[in-house]
Amino acid sequence: MNASRSIFTVIAAMFVAAAAAPAHAIQFGLKDGPGAKFNNDDLALMMARVDAGLKSPTEGEVLEWKNAKTPASGSVVPLNKLTWNGMSCRRLRITNVYGEQKAQSVYKFCEKPAGKWKLVGPDNE
């Protein structure tokens, strides 16, 4: 499984968890947020930018995406790299838009020994 597919699986799981756990849904902005309306193509476009953000050497670079077939769009901004619990991590600001609805949060991803990235959760630091 490549890193993009692994991250896609994590984000998809996050959407499922949001539907099952209303408190987390509010925190992530997924239950009633724009991401709840994303189709598979929207998610794939977003995940390609998440993958690019994790690999980007540049902090603050805005990586935008848009699905021409839906009102879905967004951006990923790579923030700082850090060490957390002994793992190499990266913070990303992820903005999701669906029509007029917009949500933005900062998430922490950490690289596992096999080179796969894992979503650790929202980053409140």
Say what each PLM segment does:
Residues 21-67:
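N-terminal trafficking/processing presequences and adjacent post-cleavage segments
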Residues 60, 87-89, 104:
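Extracytoplasmic
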Residues 64-65, 91-97:
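Short beta-strand segments that buttress and anchor functional surface loops
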Residues 69-88:
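Surface-exposed, charged secondary-structure patches
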Residues 113-124:
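Short beta-strand edge/turn micro-motifs at domain boundaries
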